[in-house]
Amino acid sequence: MTNSNKSFVLITGTTSGVGLNTLEPLIRGGWEVIAVNRSNLRAKNASIGKLSKEDLEHIHFVEIDLSDLNQVREGVGHILNEYGGHLKVIICNAAVYKPRLKRPERSMQGYENSMAVNHFGHFLLINLLIEDLTSSNSEITLNNQKVNFTPRVTILGTVTANYNELGGRIPIPAPADLGNLSGFENGFLSPISMANGKRFKPGKAYKDSKLCNMITVQELAKRYSPEKLISNSLYTGCVANTNLFRNTPWIFRFLFPLFQKFITRGYVSQRLAGERVALV
């Protein structure tokens, strides 16, 4: 089957966790998957350990470090050359969370790294692909059946960035708050590390980046009719035992899944979360 007969979904961050567990249900649904990761080697090794040999034939690996905007531009050029006109879905899943940092890490362009990866990289990726995404044919073939399909963008979300949710009001270290965006307005380069221009708080930097994701989805919904593009910010439930939390204290990694399973009842397995992402 040539690319002209295939329909592609792009997903970032598939070396572990929710992203890795989204691959199989996507392939089962008839999709070809463009897996975007910082390391193709890690992504391939993870996929080999998770998928059948037959399923692996439907994965197309593209190496992009989302923290480097130049790499995003180069990677998108490759994606458009190889799969342009056949991309139907973008799933922004990759994220970094380093709540124990004392000082901000910086991206290649000098931006605070969690904002660079979680928001800037994905924002640029979407913007460079959106014209191709929304101009594609609405009739696609999945599992040898022709179906009408509306292109879509899905960004993985979190309740900790939503002040309307209890999890978004917990003041540890502080709720998400972009203020008047003075940090962005003033260039967001050292010594600036927060969107609101205030003192660096690593946990809040993550929340702020995810709030920016939510705003991006809302803006896409304003700019494109639902017949042209469906945009979603998706919270799958609390997947409390993924590598997203690898930089938290060990006691947190031990207790947090138990708390979500038996107290809040919000716990969701990586497999179920992946299936939910594939459905959207």
What kind of feature is each model-predicted range?
Residues 2-240:
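Rossmann-fold NAD(P)H-dependent dehydrogenase/reductase core
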Residues 169-171, 240-261:
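A glycine/serine/threonine-rich, flexible loop-to-helix segment
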Residues 257-280:
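C-terminal helical subdomain
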